[in-house]
Design a protein with these regions (language model features):
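C-terminal regulatory/interaction module of P-loop NTP-utilizing enzymes
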Residues: 1-188
Length: 188
């Protein structure tokens, strides 16, 4: 709901979606038409609290909606490969320390087709294509913070390098396992 101007999107509807106005006929100010929102209609939206570039939602608008916070849940990953829940927890612990709890990585990154990842190659792919790019975005102006969250094993940190992702761990499952263990103290 913070991707657009909610007042403009909902228009006059915003005043009649409150619980005490549901099912009551009202005359719309601009068109003069009668309108109501039935009590059994639910408007469900999501809001990304981590993205500061999006539209701010004011208190008057927020009170018209119930909020349910959805945080990463590593327990969902227990049926996946060994160490997967612990890996998510360790990464998020570092993210919380460096940025905020709103920037934690969700458990869905470690799932495929609604199920936790079970194969090392799939986890390598997710790390290369999702986790590292996301962390780079979070820490675009601080190599030191990125290194603290990601460790030294996944990116070439050598002086004068372009900070490219190393290929050795992407192509070798054992090298990847070792990198995870060194960076996060988790055995996968």
């Amino acid at each position: 709901i913070n991707r657009g101007n909610i007042s403009k999107i909902f228009g006059e509807l915003i005043t009649i979606i409150e619980n005490d106005k549901r099912g009551t006929e009202v005359t719309l100010a601009y068109s003069g038409e009668q309108f109501n929102v039935p009590s059994n209609v639910y408007i469900i939206g999501t809001m990304n609290t981590a993205d500061q570039s999006l539209t701010h939602i004011d208190a008057a608008l927020k009170r018209r909606f119930s909020s349910i916070e959805v945080m990463p849940d590593s327990s969902i990953l227990k049926k996946g490969m060994k160490g997967l829940p612990e890996l998510l927890d360790k990464i998020n612990e570092k993210v919380r320390e460096k940025i905020s709890r709103d920037n934690q990585i969700g458990h869905s990154y470690f799932m495929q087709d609604g199920k936790p990842i079970t194969e090392i190659r799939d986890l390598q792919f997710v790390f290369a294509t999702d986790i590292i790019p996301l962390l780079r975005d979070y820490f675009y102006d601080s190599d030191d913070d990125l290194k603290e969250v990601l460790g030294e094993q996944f990116i070439d940190w050598n002086e004068g390098s372009d900070r490219n992702v190393k290929e050795d761990w992407q192509n070798n499952p054992e090298t990847f396992r070792t990198a995870i263990k060194e960076a996060y103290h988790v055995t996968i």
